[in-house]
């Protein structure tokens, strides 16, 4: 029996890539890497410089699977991992549609539960917006600015109460897009916003917008010929305002400016801004 357990744990360590002493760090820290095909494609296609790409990896804790896929971790404001989406990209930085996205949670379920489909289906997976952890990091930065201003005020520096209030309350607005790729790229080029991603048109819900309710929120759905994406997200925004009092709007930027051909291709904000 002891020998059986020994072989089992040895195989498990090999499967998870831990043929070394046990690593107690969170999973996203263990897997954080700029070596994915996605990260290399960002630079080679001119979306980012090498330095910008490294910043984005740190910002979103991007990971890399053994087979070169990028791991988009979904981490909440408390630093808890909800899940991780493994996606594959071609050298031109477009999705490799021959390789379907996979969830880290599903891989773990299959690893530990085998082929018991009924048991696997009975264990739900919870998701949040990609980039949700940035909200708490933003709050920490603003709190430190507030503390510094308060200290200056006490020591006699001419910092008024209104200025203290501004430092404490003006959090950056949040932009929500469909694709994780879009959020990653635009975070380096339009840093006046915090960039989050729903992970798909139908992945955005009012509940997922609740953690953002202290921020001004702007939704940027992809475009299409029939306004389906815009209408869908407009309904979600209305529900978030009704349930949680969110200050949320849906940007008509793509609907007003995209050409009929671009709408037919269902472009997103990166496609429009970079025109690649």
Task: Annotate each predicted stretch with a short phrase.
Residues 147-149, 171-174, 180-276:
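TOPRIM fold recognition
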Residues 24, 128-130, 248:
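Residue-level detector of bioactive/disordered segments in secreted/extracellular proteins
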Residues 28-30, 56-60, 89, 100-103, ...:
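Aromatic side chains
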Residues 20-21, 96, 226:
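Intrinsically disordered, low-complexity regions enriched in Ser/Pro/Gly/Gln/His and often acidic
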Residues 71-213:
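Phosphate-handling DNA/RNA-contact segment within nucleic-acid enzymes
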Residues 13, 17, 21, 33, ...:
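Intrinsically disordered, low-complexity regulatory regions of eukaryotic regulatory proteins
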Residues 8, 26, 124-127, 138, ...:
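Serine/proline-rich low-complexity intrinsically disordered segments, especially terminal tails, linkers
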Residues 1-82, 115, 275:
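TOPRIM metal-binding catalytic domain and adjacent DNA-binding surface shared by DnaG-type primases
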């Amino acid at each position: 029996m002891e020998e059986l357990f020994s072989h089992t744990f040895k195989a498990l360590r090999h499967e998870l890539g831990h043929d070394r002493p046990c690593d107690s760090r969170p999973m996203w820290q263990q897997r954080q890497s700029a070596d994915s095909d996605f990260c290399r494609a960002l630079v080679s296609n001119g979306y980012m410089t090498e330095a910008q790409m490294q910043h984005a990896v740190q910002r979103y804790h991007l990971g890399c699977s053994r087979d070169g896929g990028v791991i988009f971790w979904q981490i909440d404001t408390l630093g808890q991992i909800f899940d991780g989406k493994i996606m594959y990209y071609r050298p031109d930085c477009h999705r490799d549609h021959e390789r379907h996205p996979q969830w880290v949670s599903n891989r773990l379920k299959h690893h530990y539960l085998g082929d018991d489909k009924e048991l696997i289906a009975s264990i739900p997976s919870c998701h949040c917006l990609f980039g949700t952890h940035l909200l708490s990091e933003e709050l920490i930065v603003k709190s430190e600015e507030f503390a510094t201003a308060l200290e200056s005020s006490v020591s006699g520096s001419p910092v008024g109460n209104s200025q203290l209030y501004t430092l404490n309350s003006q959090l950056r607005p949040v932009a929500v897009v469909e694709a994780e790729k879009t959020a990653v790229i635009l975070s380096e080029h339009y840093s006046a916003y915090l960039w989050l991603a729903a992970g798909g048109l139908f992945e955005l819900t009012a509940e997922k917008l609740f953690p953002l309710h202290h921020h001004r929120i702007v939704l940027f759905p992809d475009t299409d010929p029939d306004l389906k994406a815009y209408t869908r997200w407009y309904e979600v925004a209305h529900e978030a305002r009704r349930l949680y009092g969110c200050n949320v709007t849906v940007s008509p930027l793509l609907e007003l400016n995209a050409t009929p051909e671009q709408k037919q291709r269902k472009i997103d904000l990166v496609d429009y801004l970079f025109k690649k």
